[in-house]
Every structure is written in C-alpha cells, then in structure tokens.
C-alpha cells in the first residue's frame, strides 16, 4: 500500500544498485512535519522575562512579536499565527525618535544605513537613526565651501553663517563696525534689572546687559566667548631659533634680518653660503649651481659655513665633502658645478670634449 517509489534510470551501466534506492514519499513528509509541535514558536522560557526586565535585553524584534497578543493577550489567528505570542519587553514597540535603545558608545550615524545599504543591522557599531546632531560634518565643505558630491554627500553641510561667533562688542552695547562686522549681531531686549543696578540671573539672563565701559584685557581673557586671537606656533610650542612672531601675523621670519657683514653682505650663514657659491662659480661651474649650492644646508636643517653656534639639526662642513663625480672637495655630488669635467658620472664615463670627442666619434677608414 505504501510501497516506496523507485528511480528508473535509462541506459546500461554497472551501477545498477542505485536504480532500486527508495525515495521519501509525501506521506512520510507529512508525518515528519506533524511531529514538530505547532506552538513551538510561541513557547516562552521562564527566564526570558527576567532578562527583559532586569538585564534590559531586547530578545525579539518588533517584527517577530504579534502586536494583537501584546495588547490583548489573545490573537484571533491562534496557533497558526506566524508571529510569537510572548510578552514583549519594555524596549519593544517604542515611539519614533525614542533614545531608549541608543547605545552610549554609538555617537555617529551610519553612512551606509542612510542609503539603506548597511548589512550589520543591530550588530553595527554606528547609529541607525537619522539624527542631524550626530551626523559628522563634511570636511571638504567646511574647508573649501563646496563639495563635489553635492546632494549625494553622506555628511552634513553646515552653513558658514551659522558657525559665526557672536560679536562681544555688540553684546556690550555697541559695535563700531556696524553692518560690516563679520560676527553675528544678536538683538536682545535690554534687561531692566541690570539697568536699575543689579540682575540676579547674571550671565544666564536671556536679555542684554548693556555696558558703557570698554572691556578690559582681563575680562576678555575670562570671557566664555573667544575674543582674543588664537595662539601662534611660537606661543603654543615655545620660542626658538627663527621664531619671532610677536603679533601672530606670521611676520616673525620676515622681520628677522641678518646683520650686515663685510662688503655689505649678510653675515653668518648667508655669507658662508654665498662664499661657497662663489667658489663653485670660480671653478667653471654653471650658473644654476650658484644658488643651489646652499640647498644641502637648508635641506638638512643646518646653517651654512660660518654660521653661529646654537643652530639645530644636522651639520656638515663642506670642506670635508668629496664629490664622487668630479673628485673635488667643497660640494656634494648632486650639486656638482662641474658638469663638463671628465670623470665617472654615476656609472656613465664622461670623456674629454672638443676636438678629442670629434676625433673619437669620427668614422675610421677601412
């Protein structure tokens, strides 16, 4: 009655035993499916409620829990309902915009989730919610004022006018720059208590506290608004050789000039560099080598010959340097001022020029 089906194969072959292998019938499949209880997805362990209430763990997603059962503890679909009939956690079915599920370690919005391309779901290390306060600012738009991605950029484009600071002079009562001021002029109603002599709210008062006296240097330094200029590199990292930026305008290096030496030439490193260049030029060097002769000293951060003590960085006396190209002392091989001198030029043998080269290149008779 329930004889197993057989598989008929066409063609001859030595493996005839596989043609009589029994197959699973449809009745056997029905019996196997009926052995699994239909209420298995609705079963709830006794420790699940403790995990949900005390450990604050969300065991089931909102899509897995039956909303009818969670509201009325009964479902018209009964055991055939495809969703679970369990008591939901307090983290389920939260209103839109709720921050109860927000992980404190996640502070940035996932840029892939904004396009619907994040595959990590709840395992993602970034926020899966649209929060403008947590979207990082576009570095290119903030630096250059435009972004090549345009509207497709996944980062925040902040208007530069919004990031302007408030004018501290206008907040005190008057700004001499008027509409030409680059800072924000926020209008506030004058505080009547402050005009009468005292305001108990102090700095927390939302109204304006008009002051007739100019701000002192001490008040500017203690003000919560940044009214002083930013620190220069010399002030932030300390002073040293070549740093004299007193006013923070970057003119420290330009204002420093070496004192005049002999024949009106600058003394110190400049004179030493110029002397080395003149030596190279007197030896038959090319014109471009005169200015480049001083480059090794600047590259390695050391002063030229004759420089004063106290400089920083690498030092090398040019009188001890031997050029491996021309064999002369006083310069490096990459700054050799004698390109026409015979010798080994980095593996290429250069012979004498002029008539000797013409005689060498002249075709010989048979």
Curated annotation (Swiss-Prot):
SUPFAM superfamilies in UniProt: CCCH zinc finger, Retrovirus zinc finger-like domains
Zinc finger (CCHC-type): 321-338
Any GO BP: mRNA processing
Biased composition regions of type Gly residues, renumbered to the chain: 344-354
Major localization listed first in the record, in broad terms: nucleus
Cellular compartments per GO CC: nucleus
Keyword annotations from UniProtKB, A to Z: Metal-binding, mRNA processing, Nucleus, Repeat, RNA-binding, Zinc, Zinc-finger
Record SMART domains: ZnF_C2HC (SM00343), ZnF_C3H1 (SM00356)
Alphabetical list of Pfam families matching this protein: zf-CCCH, zf-CCHC
Localization in the cell: Nucleus
GO molecular function: RNA binding; zinc ion binding
Listed InterPro entries: CPSF4/Yth1, Znf_CCCH, Znf_CCCH_sf, Znf_CCHC, Znf_CCHC_sf
Domain of life: Eukaryota
Positions of the UniProt region annotated as Disordered: 1-20, 211-255, 343-366
Biased composition (Low complexity): 212-224
Zinc finger (C3H1-type) in chain: 60-88, 104-131, 132-160, 161-188, 190-212
UniProt function note: Component of the cleavage factor I (CF I) involved in pre-mRNA 3'-end processing.
UniProt similarity note: Belongs to the CPSF4/YTH1 family.
Identification of the protein by name: mRNA 3'-end-processing protein YTH1
Source organism: Mycosarcoma maydis (Corn smut fungus)
Taxonomic lineage from the root: Eukaryota, Fungi, Dikarya, Basidiomycota, Ustilaginomycotina
Gene: YTH1
């Amino acid at each position: 009655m329930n004889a197993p089906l057989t598989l008929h194969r066409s063609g001859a072959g030595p493996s005839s035993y596989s043609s009589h292998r029994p197959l699973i019938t449809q009745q056997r499949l029905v019996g196997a499916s009926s052995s699994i209880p239909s209420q298995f997805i609705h079963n709830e362990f006794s420790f699940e409620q403790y995990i949900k209430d005390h450990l604050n763990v969300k065991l089931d997603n909102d899509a897995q829990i039956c909303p009818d059962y969670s509201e009325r503890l009964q479902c018209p679909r009964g055991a055939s309902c495809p969703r679970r009939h369990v008591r939901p956690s307090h983290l389920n079915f939260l209103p839109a915009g709720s921050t109860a599920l927000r992980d404190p370690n996640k502070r940035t919005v996932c840029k892939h989730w904004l396009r619907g391309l994040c595959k990590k779901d709840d395992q993602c290390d970034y926020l899966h919610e649209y929060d403008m306060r947590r979207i990082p600012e576009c570095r290119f738009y903030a630096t250059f004022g435009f972004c090549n991605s345009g509207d497709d950029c996944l980062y925040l484009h902040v208007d530069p006018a919004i990031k302007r600071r408030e004018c501290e002079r206008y907040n005190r009562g008057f700004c001499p720059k008027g509409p030409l001021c680059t800072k924000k002029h926020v209008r506030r109603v004058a505080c009547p208590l402050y005009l009468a002599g005292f305001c108990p709210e102090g700095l927390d008062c939302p109204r304006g506290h008009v002051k007739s006296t100019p701000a002192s240097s001490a008040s500017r330094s203690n003000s919560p608004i940044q009214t002083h200029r930013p620190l220069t590199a010399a002030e932030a990292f300390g002073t040293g050789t070549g740093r004299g930026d007193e006013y923070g305008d970057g003119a420290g290096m330009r204002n420093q000039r070496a004192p005049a030496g002999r024949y009106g030439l600058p003394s110190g490193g400049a004179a030493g560099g110029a002397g080395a260049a003149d030596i190279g030029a007197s030896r038959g060097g090319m014109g471009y080598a005169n200015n480049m002769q001083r480059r090794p000293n600047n590259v390695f951060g050391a002063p030229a010959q004759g420089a004063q003590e106290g400089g920083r960085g690498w030092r090398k006396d040019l009188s001890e340097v031997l050029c491996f190209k021309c064999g002369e002392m006083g310069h490096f091989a990459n700054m050799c001022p004698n390109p026409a001198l015979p010798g080994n030029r980095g593996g290429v043998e250069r012979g004498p020029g002029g008539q000797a080269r013409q005689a060498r290149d002249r075709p010989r008779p048979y």
